[in-house]
């Protein structure tokens, strides 16, 4: 059971927004204060069939409407334990609430037939936040009951406890804030799930804690009179019993280093998809469950937490009217070739998901200097929320640009002018004034009388006075369609025009020594007024997109 899509109207800053979800895991990203955590809060109220306070209404005079598309069962043989004759696999429901209502109303979205609120409670929702003490809300009696059950299970399935592990758990009990049973439960789970091989490692405290949180919530559901567990359990054609569970995690990056962030989120997915045999055996023995059927929602501001698949990403953004909308990776429809490039380049563009605009450049030298150029021309990238991406070649720019545009991220791209005929009709593209970056730089510096400054940059880059070789000049002249015989090799500072301009020598050296370190030196050395106009134009265009949103 999972949510396939949701339309939210009149809730907080969601005037009218539609979202499509991945059945397994969804990562919500976007700017601060755009509604990501508010969405998780809405899930909690919705699954509990509670009314929302007046402050949550976008317009208190209008009702809040939430239209849900739910995938209930996997086949005609499946059913809910308390409704064996009902084999409905999918349904669309609408939850409505007015500010004056005591409780919300539930309707079949296709027939408008009013449904009992108990129907929405088939959704079991569990939330975790790194900034709240969720574990403290659980009564100590619950952990003590779990400790008893887990200790018996551990004693019958595991070997004797080594002395170092006994000392470690005693230390946790002595210095911890919770009842001792809480730490005992973590300890037992670490052994049951075979995660105590490094008794002081993070996996003992955090990965086992993830399992404890799920076990605790299942225990509370199994012992609750509000919603009987049988109301939620799905029985398949083989008689196996599964508990549908939606879990949300808000800001997992707090207190966790990048590897542990990913490890924790991956482990939650393993639990929800029954990929841990020991955990499944524990569910079977303690609760009579053969597994879970879960969907994960993660709100994060950390690129380290994000999965490397665009299909699991849901980005919230503001349109040209300032309204919050959603770009959902699960709903993208792309060709096979484009999809290959989307997956291949996605790790490079994660940071752009949080940006207000993006600049795409062809190579390493541009990548090394553009952020420094931005500071020089008065458009600091971090302040404006501008992300700079190295496409590693002209052919990749269009593909990465397409991916970013799918997520409704404003993009400008800088191409070398030698490909202008191919790309000039595309939206949001800019071109160098000369045939490439190196020509613009060398021409601009020499035209402004900054030859000495360019010599200093090259001297720092190579540790000696710059020299052009025959191969450098041959390569450059081939690019420029000039005769290399007109440009004898030698020290740059001695270069003089013979049958061609001096900038060709500097172009030849720069063209043969591309790299991010050279780019960094160029960015650090050029002052305002020295940055080539073509580069200023693209930076200012990105700055404008970052301040005046135009989706």
Model segments located where?
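Hydrophobic/aromatic beta-strand patches that form the interior of the parallel beta-sheet core
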Residues: 28, 126-128, 297, 314, ...
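Extended helical coiled-coil dimerization/tether regions that scaffold
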Residues: 128, 132-249
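Acidic, Mg2+-coordinating catalytic modules of nucleic-acid enzymes
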Residues: 345-360, 364-551
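Conserved nucleotide-binding/hydrolysis micro-motifs of P-loop NTPases
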Residues: 72-75, 101, 132-135, 253, ...
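Short glycine-/polar-rich loops that comprise or flank the Walker A/P-loop
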Residues: 62-68, 88-93, 120-126, 243-244, ...
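Switch/communication elements of ASCE P-loop NTPase nucleotide-binding domains
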Residues: 1-48, 200-348, 545
């Amino acid at each position: 059971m999972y949510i396939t899509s949701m339309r939210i109207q009149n809730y907080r800053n969601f005037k009218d927004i539609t979202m499509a979800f991945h059945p397994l895991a969804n990562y919500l990203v976007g700017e601060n204060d755009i509604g990501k955590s508010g969405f998780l809060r809405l899930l909690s109220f919705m699954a509990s069939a509670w009314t929302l306070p007046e402050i949550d209404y976008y317009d208190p005079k209008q009702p809040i409407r939430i239209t849900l598309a739910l995938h209930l069962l996997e086949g005609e043989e499946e059913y809910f334990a308390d409704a064996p004759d009902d084999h409905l696999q999918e349904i669309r429901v609408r939850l409505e609430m007015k500010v004056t209502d005591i409780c919300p109303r539930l309707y079949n979205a296709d027939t408008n037939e009013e449904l009992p609120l108990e129907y929405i409670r088939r959704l079991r929702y569990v939330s975790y936040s790194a900034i709240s003490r969720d574990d403290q809300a659980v009564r100590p009696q619950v952990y003590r009951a779990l400790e008893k059950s887990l200790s018996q299970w551990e004693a019958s399935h595991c070997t004797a406890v080594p002395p170092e592990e006994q000392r470690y758990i005693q230390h946790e009990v002595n210095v911890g804030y919770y009842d001792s049973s809480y730490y005992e439960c973590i300890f037992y789970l670490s052994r049951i799930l075979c995660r105590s091989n490094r008794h002081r490692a993070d996996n003992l405290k955090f990965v086992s804690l993830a399992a404890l949180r799920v076990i605790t919530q299942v225990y509370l559901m199994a012992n609750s009179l509000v919603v009987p567990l049988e109301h939620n359990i799905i029985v398949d054609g083989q008689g196996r019993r599964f508990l549908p569970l939606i879990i949300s995690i808000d800001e997992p990056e707090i207190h966790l280093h990048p590897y542990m962030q990913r490890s924790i989120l991956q482990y939650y997915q393993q639990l929800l998809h029954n990929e841990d045999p020991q955990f499944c055996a524990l569910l079977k023995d303690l609760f009579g469950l053969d597994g879970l059927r879960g969907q994960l929602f993660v709100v994060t501001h950390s690129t380290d937490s994000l999965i490397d698949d665009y299909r699991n990403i849901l980005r919230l953004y503001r349109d040209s009217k300032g309204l919050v909308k959603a770009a959902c990776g699960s709903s993208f429809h792309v060709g096979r070739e484009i999809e290959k490039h989307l997956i291949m380049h996605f790790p490079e563009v994660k940071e752009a998901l949080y940006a207000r605009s993006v600049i795409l450049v062809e190579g390493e030298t541009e990548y090394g200097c553009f952020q420094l150029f931005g500071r020089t021309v008065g458009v600091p990238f971090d302040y404006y929320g501008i992300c700079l991406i190295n496409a590693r070649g002209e052919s990749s720019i269009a593909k990465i640009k397409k991916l970013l545009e799918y997520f409704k991220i404003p993009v400008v791209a800088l191409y070398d002018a030698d490909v202008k005929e191919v790309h000039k009709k595309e939206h949001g593209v800019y071109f160098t004034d000369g045939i490439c970056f190196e020509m613009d730089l060398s021409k601009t510096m020499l035209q402004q009388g900054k030859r000495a400054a360019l010599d200093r940059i090259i001297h720092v880059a190579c540790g000696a006075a710059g020299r052009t070789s025959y191969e450098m000049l041959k390569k450059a002249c081939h690019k420029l369609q000039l005769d290399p015989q007109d440009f004898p090799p030698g020290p740059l500072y001695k270069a003089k025009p013979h049958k061609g301009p001096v900038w060709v020598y500097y172009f030849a050296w720069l063209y043969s020594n591309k790299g991010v370190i050279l780019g960094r030196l160029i960015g650090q050395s050029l002052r305002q007024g020295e940055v080539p106009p073509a580069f200023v134009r693209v930076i200012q265009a990105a700055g404008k997109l970052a301040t005046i949103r135009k989706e």
